[in-house]
Structures are given as C-alpha cells and as structure tokens.
Amino acid sequence: MITISENAQQHFIKLLSQQAEGTHIRVFVVNPGTAKAECGVSYCPPDAVEADDIQLPFEGFSAMVDADSKGFLEDAEIDFTTDQMGSQLTLKAPNAKLRKVADDAPLFERVHYFLQAEVNPQLAGHGGECTLVEITDDGYAVLQFGGGCNGCAQIDVTVKDGIEKQLIELMAGEIKGVKDATEHERGDHSYY
C-alpha cells in the first residue's frame, strides 16, 4: 500500500525516538477523492489509534492509516532526501484525489479513472477538462470537453492523437475509439 524509503524510515525512527514510547506515525488524506485532497504525516500516540486503523509495520515503528484513507493511499511513496539546500520529506500519493479502480472493474469506471488520473491533470494546464458521458455498445467512449478545451483548435489532435490512442492501447479489445460530444463554441475561454 505505502512504500517508505530506507532514508525516510531512518528519519521517522529518529523523530519517534524523541516522542513518548509507543508513538507511531499516521499517514492520512484530508478531503480524499476530491481536487482539494491533501496528504499528510503526523505523530500517532497510542491513545490515538482507532479500532479500524490499518497498521503497516516497519522496522522500529508502524505507519497507521485510517480506513477512509486506505484506498486513496494505494501506491503512495514517502521519501526523505538531503542535498546542499537542506532536507525534505516527500509524500507522493497518485490516488489521493481519485481512488484507484481494480483492473477488473467495469469498463466505464476504468475509463473514467484514466480520464481523471491521466488526462484531466494535463488538460488542467490549459484550463480544460473532459468527462466520460457514456461508452456505446459498439465500444466508443463518448467524451464531453469543457473549459479551455471547448472551442480549442487543437481538440481533434487531443482526442485522436492523445486520448483515443492511449485508451485503445490500454483497453485493447474493449475500446475502439473516442467520440467528442461537445458542442464547441470558440471564444476567449478557448485555449488555442
């Protein structure tokens, strides 16, 4: 679930040695599954452990995760690096804003997850977004674009060379292509 690098483990052991005995760390997500999701690490004294917490044992300490954060911390990585500028603890949780779906989840859920996790972060740089409207019986993902994507002169490139190509590769045999259901209106909001 969570990978903690050797350097980060040593850092936590050092910090925890200055705390009350039995204190561990807690890894959590505030506002999980939303665009405002934020991850954190805090001390977890023995009296703060909840009955439904998940305990991840490491050498010298445990990482406690509350049940609500579990799915959002899948594939999370914690590292501690030191360079000439100082030291830094980093926590990367690629599923904090959107819970990872199982490989055998329904096709709609897998395509939706791909769009939210991979495509929308890139489109957001242009003020754009896309949502999955439906998957047709003949295997086409129907998308609706908004924000900077609406009316953008590059939308065909984004759809055909970007999203469609990746979806066909990732979901071979299940997705045949992508259709754009957006009524594009060029305006000041359009990126290109």
Curated annotation (Swiss-Prot):
GO biological process terms, semicolon-separated: iron-sulfur cluster assembly; protein maturation
Pfam families named among the record's database cross-references: Fe-S_biosyn (PF01521), NifU (PF01106)
Superkingdom, natural source: Bacteria
Keywords attached to this entry: 4Fe-4S, Iron, Iron-sulfur, Metal-binding
Entry annotated with the keyword Metal-binding: yes
Cofactor(s) of this protein: [4Fe-4S] cluster
Coiled coil residues, start to end: none
Molecular functions per Gene Ontology: 4 iron, 4 sulfur cluster binding; iron ion binding
Manner of cofactor binding, per the entry note: Binds 1 [4Fe-4S] cluster per subunit. The cluster is presumably bound at the interface of two monomers.
Family annotation (NCBIfam families): PRK11190.1, YhgI_GntY
Family from the record: Belongs to the NfuA family.
Subunit structure: Homodimer.
Protein name: Fe/S biogenesis protein NfuA
